[in-house]
UniProtKB/Swiss-Prot annotation:
Pathway membership, UniProt: Cofactor biosynthesis; ubiquinone biosynthesis [regulation]
Transmembrane annotation, as ranges: 21-41, 502-522, 523-543
Protein name in UniProt: Probable protein kinase UbiB
Keyword Kinase: yes
Residue numbers annotated as active site: 284
Primary site of residence: membrane
Taxonomic classification: Bacteria, Pseudomonadati, Pseudomonadota, Gammaproteobacteria, Oceanospirillales
GO cellular component: plasma membrane
Molecular functions per Gene Ontology: ATP binding; protein kinase activity
Organism listed in the record: Hahella chejuensis (strain KCTC 2396)
E.C. numbers: 2.7.-.-
Length: 546
């Protein structure tokens, strides 16, 4: 019942803000187009406010999942009209706050102390309010300035309802759309469910923040604020307050004489460092979570907050991704095609030459061009068409990475439109690959694994024995399977034979009856002998042992 109520709530918001205006009717099949034209929202008058504001307000009312979708879109001025993208930027830190007295109560219940004892000063009005939590400024007893992040009450229930509806839609897509299974929508939604539910646990966010801070300790690329663990709970997070210019405020960055080219290049370097050096990356890098330290404009440094969503890669995915990107940067499209096939991302029967030609057609137009001259919308459309043509399957484990890459590319486009993304990224990847296969890299890998190998050495005989034992069981299992298959095959052949006999017997008996029927009724002894012979043959076919 709650799902139905939530569905009605979503439809009501769509109706009230007339979001049907944003539906691409010309791209929908005729039945869906008719459904849209007859839907109840057309009975509502269009509000007398700009369409961008209508979209933003609707996303805010619908909740965090929809807000996060809007945050991703806000960086895509190449995909959205400028008025929509500019309005959606307000989603990043202008979501309406919840009551301050409720925030105080959550803090005191979680940390088991009154706010007056925890802080020398606590600002009851929030300094920022987002879809999942809001942030209050405070000062510790020792004089350090901090921010206090508090989870919105009741937000988990709303998120779980939205996820349930998304799963329902995903199952419908997977079962009834021809491309559904290739896109793995159910698996993608389930992965997203784990991600966003984890974001509701502020202790997990604190752990992610601490890990990122260690990874970039002493770095001039990015600064991560300090977490105060003694004042952290699953619903409350206290961390160092930072000061910087929001990354989206390009005008202010230029006024501060920030080296915009260096800033954009460092954004790319930070992304690839997280993915390939650390295999641990901040996966919610929309403009509301990124600031710039402009104290040294010639050497600007990023500041990242809100580390609730992070991504990781397996060594296998990391290796395949790096090799694919390097081949792509070198325009070695055949290698890209071969890697996609060998990794199972496209079916093994795919013709390499055809796939190589398709990749070249999509990718060649975007090389040696700055971001401002690349239509990312057209690039994505061509990429999706190629994926569909060659049955390329979506890799759910890489969806978070792709979302992050979209954010980074969008930020780079805003900061320094002349940035050549490919030439900036290629040297970093080449250096990373060289380090992996060079003697120091191999020695480091051996050192990392050596303790595990040594620890398992005494167990090696038992491991070998169990492996051979499993092989013996596997042989018996295979033999049993072969026997079962042989039995099924015999049963199938027997069934086919019976069907043939029934059809033949019916035909023979019908022929016998036709020959026996004449103008005069016959006694049994007067039946023609051919008819009798056919009848006997038909009865034999019906009654013979099977």
């Amino acid at each position: 019942m709650r799902r139905i109520n939530r569905l009605f709530q979503i439809v009501w918001v769509i109706c009230r803000y007339r979001l049907d205006e944003f539906a691409p009717l010309t791209l929908l099949p005729l039945p869906l187009r008719l459904l849209f034209l007859l839907a109840p929202w057309r009975l509502f008058p269009k509000p007398q406010i700009p369409r961008g504001e209508r979209l933003r307000r609707a996303l805010e009312e619908l909740g965090p999942i929809f807000v996060k979708f809007g945050q991703i879109l806000s960086t895509r001025k190449d995909l959205l009209p400028e008025d929509l993208a500019d309005e959606l930027k307000r989603l990043q830190d202008k979501v309406p706050p919840f009551a301050s007295d409720m925030a105080v109560r959550i803090i005191e219940e979680s940390l088991k102390s009154p706010v007056s004892e925890l802080f020398a000063d606590f600002q009851t009005y929030p300094m920022a309010s987002a879809s999942i939590a809001q942030v209050h400024a405070a000062t510790l007893k020792n004089g350090k300035e901090v921010v206090v992040k508090v989870i919105r009450p009741g937000i988990e229930k709303t998120i779980r309802l939205d996820i349930a509806l998304m799963l329902l839609v995903a199952r419908l897509v997977e079962n009834y759309w021809e491309d559904g299974k290739r896109l793995h929508p159910v698996e993608v939604v389930k992965d997203y469910e784990h991600t966003i539910i984890d974001e509701l646990d502020l202790q997990r966010e604190a752990a992610n923040t601490s890990q990122l801070k260690r990874n970039f300790a002493g770095s001039e690329l990015i600064y991560i604020p300090e977490v105060y663990w003694e004042m952290t709970h699953s619903r409350v997070l206290v961390m160092e307050r930072i000061y910087g210019v929001p990354i989206a405020d390009v005008e202010q960055l230029r006024k501060a004489n920030v080296n915009m080219k260096l800033l954009a290049e460092r954004g790319v370097e930070i992304f690839f460092t997280q993915v390939f050096r650390d295999s641990f990356f901040h996966a919610d890098m929309h403009p509301g979570n990124i600031f710039v330290d402009v104290s040294n404009p010639a050497n600007p440094r990023y500041i990242a907050i809100d580390c609730g969503i992070v991504g990781t890669l397996t060594p296998e995915d990391q290796s395949y991704l790096a090799r694919n990107l390097l081949a792509f940067f070198r325009r070695d499209y055949r290698q890209v095609a071969v890697l996609h096939i060998s990794s199972g991302w496209v079916p093994g029967h795919t013709r390499v030459n055809e796939f190589e030609a398709a990749i070249r057609t999509v990718c060649e137009p975007i090389f040696e061009r700055p971001l401002k001259d690349i239509s990312f919308g057209q690039f994505l459309m061509r990429l999706f068409q190629t994926a569909r043509r060659f049955d390329m399957e979506v890799q759910p484990q890489l969806v978070l990475l792709q979302k992050t890459l979209l954010n980074i590319e969008g930020l780079g486009r805003q900061l320094y439109p002349d940035l050549d993304l490919w030439s900036t990224a290629q040297p970093f990847l080449e250096n990373w690959m060289k380090q992996r296969i060079a003697p120091p890299g191999l020695l480091k890998a051996i050192k990392q694994h050596a303790p595990d190998w040594i620890e398992q050495t005494p167990e090696l005989p038992q491991i070998l024995y169990e492996a051979f034992d499993q092989l013996r069981h596997l042989d018996r299992y295979n033999q049993a399977n072969q026997d079962s298959l042989a039995s099924l095959s015999r049963a199938f052949e027997k069934d086919k034979q019976q069907r043939r006999d029934f059809w033949l017997a019916g035909l023979v008996l019908a022929s016998a009856a036709a020959m026996a029927i004449g103008d005069q009724p016959l006694r049994l002894t007067e039946l023609p002998w051919p008819s009798v012979m056919l009848a006997v043959a038909g009865l034999y076919l019906l009654m013979r042992p099977k």
